[in-house]
Amino acid sequence: MSIEQKINGDVGTLILGEEIDLDSSPTVRENIKDLLTSTKIVEVNLANVSYIDSSGIASLIEGMQMAKQQTGKEFHLVDVSNEVMKVIE
């Protein structure tokens, strides 16, 4: 799995690639947590994700919950790939 962080003002973008599974989920959670600490808005770009399992979905839900617990924070999924959408739906 590849992970890239970009920060532009109050917006932190986490660009994920390839697979989000049991092995990579802790890293995804930590990156989301880091961006929530340093920015107001976190966007998780899933355009390049070809596979996600239940632990990957759980990491995204935990990110959303972390954002909700912090006043003024936002969490968004952007450019969700078809493969990820099939799992979410």
Which residue ranges define each predicted feature?
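Amphipathic alpha-helical interaction surfaces in cytosolic regulatory modules
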Residues: 22-89
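A composition-driven signal for long, intrinsically disordered, charge-rich low-complexity tracts
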Residues: 1-2, 64
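STAS-typified acidic loop motif
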Residues: 2-30, 47
